[in-house]
């Protein structure tokens, strides 16, 4: 079997497992507050390549990390990614109306509910990591995710992106933004 086929099978298996995990760990459909839960599920379960969870599983399997920690780390990464997409699609940012071939969360649920869904997904990402069976490992992961998503990470990069709207950034600006 070629390495490409082996990787493809591995990625497909992990992605299927991740879909089941996300479906299981998100609040259940119809659970109160129904619109918020619906918007959260819509944002996370709407498809996508699941690159972040796959990278998490790959790195974790290489380092022989426990499966439960890998699941929680992969879920936290995807929750952060989904929250960032929900916020990025909003009219105040990129004003996108389609994501993954369907209406964005704010188009489907309204701006206020989409904002709350993004906020709730961010909070859930940290709650998932805080629930890791080894509290010290969980806290290290919480800190790593907070730094990666915060002012000197993803949010900082988005701020730089917004500051350059209408401008043609140079290589230095692009490198700085991409490093965050």
Summary of predicted features, one role per range:
Residues 1-3:
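N-terminal, positively charged, Ser/Thr/Ala/Gly-biased leader segments
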Residues 6, 13-26, 30-180:
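Mg2+-dependent prenyl diphosphate-binding active-site environment of isoprenoid biosynthetic enzymes
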């Amino acid at each position: 079997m070629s390495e490409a086929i082996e990787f493809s099978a591995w990625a497909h298996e992990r992605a299927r497992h991740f879909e089941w995990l996300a479906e299981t760990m998100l609040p259940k459909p119809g659970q109160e507050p129904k619109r918020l839960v619906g918007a959260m599920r819509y944002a996370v379960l709407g498809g996508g390549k699941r690159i972040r969870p796959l990278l998490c599983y790959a790195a974790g399997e290489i380092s022989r990390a426990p499966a439960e920690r890998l699941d929680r780390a992969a879920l936290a990464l995807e929750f952060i990614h989904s929250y960032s997409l929900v916020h990025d699609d909003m009219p105040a940012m990129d004003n996108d109306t389609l994501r993954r071939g369907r209406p964005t969360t704010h188009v489907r649920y309204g701006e206020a509910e989409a904002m709350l869904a993004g906020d709730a997904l961010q909070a859930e990402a940290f709650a998932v990591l805080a629930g890791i069976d080894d509290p010290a490992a969980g806290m290290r992961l919480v800190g790593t995710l907070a730094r990666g998503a915060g002012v000197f990470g993803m949010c900082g990069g988005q701020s730089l992106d917004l500051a350059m709207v209408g401008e043609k950034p140079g290589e230095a600006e692009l490198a700085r933004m991409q490093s965050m």
